[in-house]
Amino acid sequence: MYEKGEHIVFEVSGPLTILNVLIDPKYVFKGMRKKPELMARIFAKLGKEILAYMKLAKEQGADFISYADSSGGVNILGPKMAEQMVNLFTYDFVKQAGKLADEHTMILLCPKTTFALLGTGKAKLIDCQIHDDRSQEEDSLSYAEACIRMKGKYVLQDRCA
């Protein structure tokens, strides 16, 4: 596909979404409350495997690696547990994942992960201008077109506090 000019997007799920498929989430949430050290080890193990998976995607030519942990949003976890998750896993994981970003590969974060990082003060939002040389009569850039133009210009790890 890449040889034909297509852009490759590889989607990766976070640990809460993965665990949500394997076991009842109430046990994960209970573990986070009662045994945070154990959950930290579990999340670290999953994070290591997810990063290895992302690295393989990059090596195979993925232009974009999209990370989402939809089960980890504030609307599901609540503010206190969402903050715990950011401190326990998400912040360090995103910093490591950001190291995979370069002029060939861009790391995309789902809005829930982004807002969790912003809400805990672990990241800041930077408004990026994209030059669009089309006339005003034409449609504006799509999200995909904007991502393609941004690739290689903004590295994720530089965006975390």
Predicted regions and their residues:
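Active-site loop segments of alpha/beta catalytic cores
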Residues: 1-161
